[in-house]
Amino acid sequence: MNSPAPPLVVKVGGSLFDRVVPLLEIFREVGRPVLIVPGGGKFADLVRRLAVSDTAGHWMAIAGMEQFGWYIASHGVPAAFRLTLPSEVTVLLPYCALREIDPVPHSWNVTSDTIAAWVAKELSADLLLLKSVDGIHHHRRLLSRVEDPSLTPDEVDPAFIRFVFEHGLRARVVSGRHDDRVRRALRDEAVVGTLVDPRF
């Protein structure tokens, strides 16, 4: 008998706001414990347009993640206010946890992608980034794997890949707009997308 899959940190990009309900249905269908890290989406985009300091912008953007997190929680998803491995589909409301530790630079080079990677590091969990793109591209070609830690593609924030390599994490970037890809990624099966895994 196969052992249950370990908990997984899943960042749901803010661009997938319209996909929250079907994504939650897939998470529950697959049955793997998932800790959702919400993206900032439109909330963070608004902050970018304001003339505020880096520190103010940082915390305002994280507050935006929190708002998206509450939206996810409103669909019957338990909310977590501290870093903890989930036993079911759970959404992290990250503001308090991040204020307490303040682990990442206050810069637009660090957004919810790297924050999700930090959560995965703290919990010793793998990471799945669900976005509205197929994965990470280089010279217009979809990369099945990232092997260069200095790569700074448009699909993730500038600090993300280096952070993953520095901390030996395993991360996938997969489109959240294809149900079957999401299922396969949750089951650790081969899937269209990009693997970032410096351990192999």
Segments the model singles out, each with a brief description of its role:
Residues 1-200:
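C-terminal catalytic "cap/lid" subdomain
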